[in-house]
A protein has these predicted regions:
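Regulatory N- and C-terminal appendages and interdomain linkers associated
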Residues: 150-173
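Active-site catalytic-loop/activation-segment of kinase and kinase-like phosphoryl-transfer enzymes
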Residues: 1-53, 146
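Short glycine/proline-enriched coil/turn segments at helix->beta-strand junctions
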Residues: 77-80, 124-129
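Glycine-rich, phosphate-binding/catalytic loops in enzymes
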Residues: 82, 99-101, 162
């Protein structure tokens, strides 16, 4: 389901951020980020891990996913939280949407209590894979810092470097 938009999203998550020449000068976002990003764009082993993860993303699953589950798709209304922009929805791996959400909690420097709240309130299936969850969390952190889909993050270069290292550690578990 929704194969074309999933392929488009795949390119923006798993391919474009790791091209050395992708049309985005990261120094225009954060001075020094372009050169620092090369360690990820030139890491052959990391790119192999990312390719396998991308294939997992493209595989069919049994969970209906939003497909772009980040704060820009969450609206707080008087009736509670509403989720918008379902155009990337598809049946896939539950770990994907949860990983995207957790990545954005990292990117916005949420306190540990928020992560505990998610852990304690998300009902995981018996087949839920925590390593896959970590990998999807890591790839989203990487793509939002060194990819084309930039966000208005109030993070200095040292903070971005720290998050990038965390992302790689999540991916390479």
């Amino acid at each position: 389901a929704n194969r074309e938009l999933r392929k488009l999203n795949h390119e923006h998550i798993f391919i474009y951020p790791f091209l050395e020449e992708n049309g985005l000068n990261l120094d225009s976002v954060t001075p020094g980020l372009q050169e620092f990003s090369l360690r990820y764009k030139q890491d052959v082993r990391l790119k192999e891990v990312i390719e396998r993860l991308g294939n997992n993303y493209l595989s069919d699953g049994d969970t209906l996913l939003h497909g772009d589950f980040y704060p820009g798709s969450w609206l707080h209304t008087s009736d509670g939280v509403k989720i918008i922009d379902p155009e990337f929805s598809f049946y896939g791996l539950a770990e994907f949407d949860v990983g995207i959400m957790l990545a954005h909690l990292h990117l916005t420097r949420q306190p540990p209590a928020i992560f505990e709240l998610v852990e304690n309130n998300y009902s995981k299936s018996l087949t839920f894979d925590n390593e896959l969850l970590d990998a999807f969390t890591g790839i989203e952190i990487l793509r939002r810092i060194i990819g084309l889909a930039q966000l208005p993050l109030s993070l200095a270069l040292p903070e971005k470097k720290q998050l990038l290292e965390k992302a790689v550690s999540l991916l390479k578990k």
